[in-house]
């Protein structure tokens, strides 16, 4: 069974559309939704292992210009 995580993303002012577009292009990101509340975006990430999820988040998602903070919730 694949590992799955929900990544709650806070973006810099005015960067939401750009961040959504970039996240859609990252391999392993299965869905990206703009939401209301304390976070601006929720992305669903899936990979074969938790280590791969960690790599996607730290090397790909955190590198996206316009992301100011993330919180990752692993599905159990």
Give the predicted meaning of each segment.
Residues 1-76:
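A compositional/biophysical signature of low hydrophobicity enriched in polar/charged and small residues
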């Amino acid at each position: 069974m694949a590992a799955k995580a929900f990544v709650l993303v806070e973006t810099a002012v005015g960067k939401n559309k750009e961040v959504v577009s970039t996240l859609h292009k990252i391999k392993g990101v299965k869905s990206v939704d703009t939401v209301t509340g304390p976070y601006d975006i929720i992305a669903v990430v899936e990979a074969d292992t938790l280590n791969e999820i960690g790599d996607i988040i730290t090397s790909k998602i955190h590198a996206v210009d316009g992301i100011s903070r993330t919180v990752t919730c692993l599905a159990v």
